[in-house]
């Protein structure tokens, strides 16, 4: 962690704190001075104590540290999302080359997982079959992890498109079981809710309406006592869609209510997407 010392110094000076004020009861002043020059390492415990004394959250520190940001998973996901949404094959291949290099340098398994996601998406874009071996790597990793954290939730969410439906169904239930200890972390629960919504969409596309309805109910329970209005509205829409597929008029009301909520919140892009989804599947409101 010695490379973060100079950034700690910048934050300290920006907050008008002296070395003595920051170091008090955490580390010695000479040690802190040495650490801030990048000449010494520091324990994780002391590093977090310094951040706490500075009143800076780890997420804020990551955003402030340009060098660190280049290597974060958030940075990769941001670039991947942009490339995928724009069908930018050149950028996808560049990201793939970068992830191969990062993996060679660090042996961090996330860079291997990122390569798999990229290769599978490129296969999809170029009309090639998904690699079953690569799918197996993701599946086995997720199954052997005892407790899922944000990384595992996001990995699963970004792998849904190439995993077999049966695997996806099993893993979403695994995700719910293995993240219960992290329910108090709002962002993890929020991301999990989005993942559940994506699995529901996949089940509906496969015409597995009963399984989709079961997962909708599971998703609704997950969202109890939360303010995740987008996800709640999204589930309401697809509950309505399932009812429409079953020939029940109530489904039209549910879908219209969900779209009206999106319009009221000025989320016209999602409202248009949901309306187009109905049109594509033979339903008009």
Residue ranges of model-derived segments:
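A short, Lys/Arg-rich alpha-helix, primarily the initiator
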Residues: 1-14
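"A position-specific structural signal for the A-helix of alpha-solenoid helical repeats
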Residues: 7, 78, 112-121, 154-158, ...
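Short alpha-helical DNA-recognition segment
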Residues: 16-33
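DNA major-groove recognition helix of helix-turn-helix/homeodomain DNA-binding modules
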Residues: 45-60
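Short, charged recognition helix plus adjacent turn
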Residues: 64-90, 260
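TPR-repeat structural position
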Residues: 89, 165, 209, 248-249
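Amphipathic alpha-helical segments of tetratricopeptide repeats
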Residues: 96-101, 137-143, 176-183, 216-227, ...
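Mid-protein regulatory/catalytic core that forms ligand/cofactor-binding pockets
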Residues: 101-208
């Amino acid at each position: 962690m010695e490379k973060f010392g100079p950034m700690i110094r910048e934050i300290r000076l920006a907050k008008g704190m002296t070395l003595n004020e920051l170091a008090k009861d955490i580390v010695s002043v000479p040690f802190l001075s040495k650490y801030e020059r990048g000449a010494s390492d520091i324990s994780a415990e002391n590093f977090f104590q310094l951040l706490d004394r500075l009143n800076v959250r780890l997420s804020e520190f990551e955003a402030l540290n340009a060098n660190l940001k280049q290597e974060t998973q958030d940075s990769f996901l941001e670039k991947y999302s942009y490339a995928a949404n724009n069908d930018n094959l050149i950028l996808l291949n560049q990201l793939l080359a970068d992830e191969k290099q990062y993996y060679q340098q660090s042996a961090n398994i996330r860079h291997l997982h990122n390569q798999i996601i990229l290769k599978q998406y490129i296969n999809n874009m170029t009309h090639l079959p998904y690699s079953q071996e690569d799918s197996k790597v993701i599946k086995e990793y997720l199954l052997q992890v005892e407790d899922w954290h944000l990384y595992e939730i996001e990995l699963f969410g970004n792998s849904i498109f190439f995993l077999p439906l049966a695997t996806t169904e099993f893993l979403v239930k695994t995700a719910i079981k293995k993240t219960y200890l992290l329910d108090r972390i709002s962002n993890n629960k929020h991301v999990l809710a989005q993942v559940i919504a994506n699995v529901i969409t996949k089940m509906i596309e496969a015409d597995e309406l009963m399984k989709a309805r079961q997962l909708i109910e599971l998703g609704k329970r997950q969202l109890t006592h939360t303010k995740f209005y987008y996800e709640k509205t999204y589930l309401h829409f697809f509950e309505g869609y399932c009812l429409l597929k079953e020939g029940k008029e109530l489904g039209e009301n549910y879908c219209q209510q969900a779209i009206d909520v999106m319009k009221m919140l000025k989320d016209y892009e999602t409202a248009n997407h949901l309306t187009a989804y109905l049109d594509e599947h033979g339903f008009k409101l």
